[in-house]
């Protein structure tokens, strides 16, 4: 474990001093590159996304029957894109800043099965593991109708195996729900910030929920340790998993199709800005990778983190990645945005994606709660606090004169822009919990 000299670090990177002071800051990386240059650092390509997409299609008949809420989309787990013009007006008034272009919301908050962005990666990794086990056992071939997985023989087979994961909440929900449905024995190691209702829902499904008084990093480490001691246990590693990453990446081609259907153009003169809440980085990193593969250099991804948990901005800005945590510089990693309460970023995602991400911003809990209330009033859309992290993004981009000048985003180009706020969770929040969120504004 390296020792961090804070004085030296803040001298070299003055932005770190502002992070330590819990200020809301933004940083637009001057070292970003074109997709063709940055892609080699990811180590994955379009064929990997296609492989993931095809796997999800194979499982669609099973999902449509196992989870009736997915029947109307024929077993495809996808969310809608909605305009939020009233919220756009609220933001413009609140910050006295006109947002050029249109503002849209991507409602991963209301994805079927688990009500968060983690329904993409988490469910995909469980399905990938189940497919591998069943094919190796001679119970399944890729040409089969996967709805046969509903048969009792498959549940009996999967009962012989277990799955473990460490989570702040939403990933555990997705993996717990999916694993339990297939028949796996599943343990979810939950960090201190995980919401009680998420733990209760998992326990009601027969999931083994193990609680920790410490943060996300400890929960992940304990989950990993449990799996190491059991050859039948598969550990889903949110910090390093390429499978999770690819599950999220399929979102890119699907969003492109949604935009095509809506007649939304994305090109050099019509840029797309996407604002993604970031915890450890797997979800936003995978989605950003998929978006880059779908829209190329015309999509500009910006990660949003709580002021108390700015692990990705800290890791990328200093170049230390997962060798530094927010706790190393005296930040407590305690935030109302429980899904983003991560002190140490994924080294895999940071290194893979740093050249392809335009920028990073931090936002206070107070501002997230205020935005949550404003969105509820303006659009009647209810989200959990972490899902609002990116809502300030269009204001930050509009006010970032240096970034816009460097990228040659003049007023004409910005007038043609699409701003997409990625809402990451909230669709399954119980009414009484949502009421308490709204009271906090």
UniProtKB/Swiss-Prot annotation:
Cofactors: pyridoxal 5'-phosphate
Keywords: Lyase, Pyridoxal phosphate
Top-level EC class: lyase
Molecular-function annotations in GO: D-serine ammonia-lyase activity; hydro-lyase activity; pyridoxal phosphate binding
Enzyme Commission number(s) of this protein: 4.3.1.18
Similarity remark: Belongs to the serine/threonine dehydratase family. DsdA subfamily.
Cited PANTHER family: D-SERINE DEHYDRATASE, THREONINE DEHYDRATASE, MITOCHONDRIAL-RELATED
Protein name as catalogued: Probable D-serine dehydratase
Organism: Vibrio cholerae serotype O1 (strain ATCC 39541 / Classical Ogawa 395 / O395)
